[in-house]
Structure formats: structure tokens, C-alpha cells
Amino acid sequence: PEKDMLKDLYQTDDFFFYKSDAIKRMRLVKIEFRKVYRQDDEHFLHILENVRLNKVTPENIMHLNDRVHIPTAEDGAVITLASINKTADKINLQRLEEIESEEFVYEGTIDGKFEEKKFPVDMKLRLKVGAQVMFTRNDQQKRWANGTLGKVSKLTKDEISVTLNNGETYIVPCCSWESYSYDYNKEERKMKKELIGTFTQYPLKLAWAITVHKSQGMT
């Protein structure tokens, strides 16, 4: 639908932003950034530049590895950053298996249509008391936010309690996410939005490891 709308508006099959009407009407000034403001360590800047240009040397790797810190229990809740979901999932399941307590599985529900690739959390949420978890949705009462970390403190068939890093413990309610379809109305030249389904599940996921993509969204 979005493609049909853009094709109708711009009368072209090229949908690059610089071909938009807004850009064409602007007196666009091009600026190239050359000075780094976030770092003042010249040696570190040189390493970062080599990484960016794919020219990393063995010395660069050694310098970075020298600063690797292996987390200990004293570090508290720490997270492993993974490049892909598959790696993060593997680490999380390994850590979950290490906990010697009863496992509970909470299964989400779908009403209508909701694509699996759009699930905000797992359809089958596997948890144990002591598991490190992350909230995936803001709380309306502002007790936690998307990305808040905690540990599972109590589990029953119908109830999950999580203790946040600040020491506060809450019973976590289920949440529903909505899925929409979009259709372009050529006569009105507008996109029409229609609710097609909902997905209901606890807003939690195992969080010993998360993807870099997810971590960037938390900052």
C-alpha cells in the first residue's frame, strides 16, 4: 500500500528521499562532518577509524581485547550484547537451564491475524525464579519502562512477580499488542488503517543477552 501511495504522489518508481517534493523545494546545504566530538583519545579514535574502514590490525585487536572485562557476581545484572537474535536466544536458554528450579511456560494468545515475525515477545515464555528478564513495554503506572531489567522472584500458573534492580517487586500483568493493515485509497489519496488482530502475552523476555539492535533502542 505504501508503494502505491508513493508511486501515485511522485509519479515514479524511485522512492529515494532525495527525490521527494519537499527536498526538491528546499535550498539544500550539504555538510560533511569531519571532526569527532565524542572522543578525544587520538589512539582510540585511530582504532575506531580502522574498524570503520575495515582496516583493523592485530595491534588494534589486542588493544581492544585488553579492555575486556569478564563479569562476576559482584557486577550485578549485566548483559551480553549479541549481533543476532539466534545468538542471544542460545545464551538466554543456556543460562535458564543453569537455574535449578521449576520451569513455568506462559503461552500467548492471538485474536485475529498477527504475524509471527512481529511478535514483541515469545509466544511461549519460559521462566524460572531467579531468571534475569527485561520488560518490553512501558507501564501505564510508570513503575517500569521498555528495557527495564529485573529478576523473577515468584512464579505461579497465573502470576509472575519481578523484582527490579531498585529492589521494588511487582506482579506483572499481561499486555496486548495490536496489528494493523494499511490500504491506499487513491480517490482520497490517503492511507486507511484497519485493526486486524491482537497478541496478548506478558511483556517480558529473558535478558542475560540481547541484540545490539535492541540495546540501541534503549539508549
Cite the ranges covered by each PLM segment.
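Conserved ATP-binding/catalytic motifs of P-loop helicase motor domains
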Residues: 1-219
